Amino acid sequence: MQSVLVLDFGSQYTQLIARRIRELGIYSEILPYSTTPEAIREHDPKAIILSGGPTSVYGESAILPHPGIFSLGLPILGICYGLQAIANHFGGAVESSSKQEFGRAKILVDRTEGHESMLFKDIPDSDVWMSHGDKVTRMPEGFQITASSGNSEMCAIESFGPKAALKIYGLQFHPEVQHTLYGKQLLSNFLINIAGIRPDWSSKSFIEHQIEDIRQRADKGTVICGISGGVDSTVAAVLVSKAIGKQLHCVFVDNGLLRKNEARKVMEFLKPLGLNITLADSADLFLGRLKGVASPEKKRKIIGRTFIRVFEEHINEEKFLVQGTLYPDVIESQSVKGPSETIKSHHNVGGLPKRMKLKLIEPLRELFKDEVRAVGRELGIPEDILMRHPFPGPGLAVRVLGSLTRERLDILREADEIYIDELKSSGLYQQVWQAFSVLLPVQSVGVMGDKRTYENVLALRAVESTDGMTADWAHLPHDFLAKVSNRIINEVRGINRVAYDISSKPPATIEWE
């Protein structure tokens, strides 16, 4: 399978680059900006893309690619900071721009004789998405301008003449962002027409590759999988089961942090999938360890450690642990690919004990949620399982803000069931990416039955997204919200006020904790 490497310099859009490449049917992988030429050769890519980034190539904190990558003989496309890194390496100049560009801009493609670029084949002058404060001010020798904007004369450059064979291209704008009208066509021109890559990546090929990899890693060893009934862990379990069959033992842990009747429902709809599942009732253990803990980070780490301990109690000779970790989990947990800032740890990444006895198998680690669902369909998993809304690994622990009690968990369960049931009966459930309720550590004054109340505040959350990396708050009908609020306040003892969260990601995250 032919592939592309994306070297990450810390851009918020790096993962979008990988997604857009995969949408073209080409496998992509993200590696740190500092990856050596030797390591790149081991991956055997057909092209390299340099991502954008938050630093300046001329600053003391500049992060630069290994100079040897430009001698590998591979086509290279630099995006934003990647363009500036190319210009810097080949002797050009990059300076702070007196007029920064953030948002839409129009580029003019140079079509004069001798300047025609394969990169801009069939691409007219059009709107692109800019996000930069620096710009190239002196062209590196052996390069030519192929497009410009009102603020960036050297908006697109490429090697030409004696250096044409290098096939090195640079763009000041972001082709991976949807606001760049011909961004996908531009990436296709680079990868297929210039690099000559054959589109051969699909859900089917991903499954075949993972099955082979899982069999090699697990060999004849036994494997344990913590399964929650959510999309991620279910797809991961079915994929691993397809690879090693009876070597896989699944454990569904009732940690006391699940939604109403979740344990029973999960066991019922997973049964037809033929998985070997054991139910572990560990609610007392989890809630005991979480007693008095208010910090969301501490909650996540305690839950991660406790999950592993529970699994270890259910293993005999198992050597591996399967997790449904996804790419957004990894990105938000730690800067594993580049200098991006850690946002929060995930219980199934940063919360794991450093000295756990089990080795990890994470077959979905490089996939986004929509790709996981596509893999699930290829595996034959029913649509009603695949289209369930994401549910966090720590469960309701991160939806009951502050310290946990059984009473507060039960209040949230009752309210959330009403919210989700109303979404489904109104035909809105599948129109949003994720919806849930959050019990706040806040109380408010109210009046019920001519009596003063001082009870809990509940927040409703619903967002629209495709991959969980960015999200917009869902504009649910006011009549619907009024109905849900009225039902919750009247039917759930302990809540006298309901609010609706209208924050997008960024700046907020989807979950509150």
Swiss-Prot record:
InterPro entries: Class_I_gatase-like, GATASE, GMP_synth_C, GMP_synth_GATase, GMP_synthase, GMPS_ATP_PPase_dom, NAD/GMP_synthase, Rossmann-like_a/b/a_fold. GO terms for molecular function: ATP binding; GMP synthase activity. It catalyses: XMP + L-glutamine + ATP + H2O = GMP + L-glutamate + AMP + diphosphate + 2 H(+). Residues 3-200 form the Glutamine amidotransferase type-1 domain. Pathway: Purine metabolism; GMP biosynthesis; GMP from XMP (L-Gln route): step 1/1. One of its GO terms (cellular component) is cytosol. Disulfide bonds: none annotated. Its EC number is 6.3.5.2. It holds the Pfam family NAD_synthase. Signal peptide: none annotated. Residues 201-388 form the GMPS ATP-PPase domain. ATP binds at residues 228-234. The active site is at 80 (nucleophile), 174, 176. Keywords: ATP-binding, Glutamine amidotransferase, GMP biosynthesis, Ligase, Nucleotide-binding, Purine biosynthesis. It comes from the Bacteria. The keyword Chaperone does not apply. It is an enzyme of class 6 (ligase). HAMAP family: GMP_synthase. Homodimer. Catalyzes the synthesis of GMP from XMP. This is GMP synthase [glutamine-hydrolyzing]. It comes from Chlorobium luteolum (strain DSM 273 / BCRC 81028 / 2530). The lineage of its organism: Bacteria, Pseudomonadati, Chlorobiota, Chlorobiia, Chlorobiales.
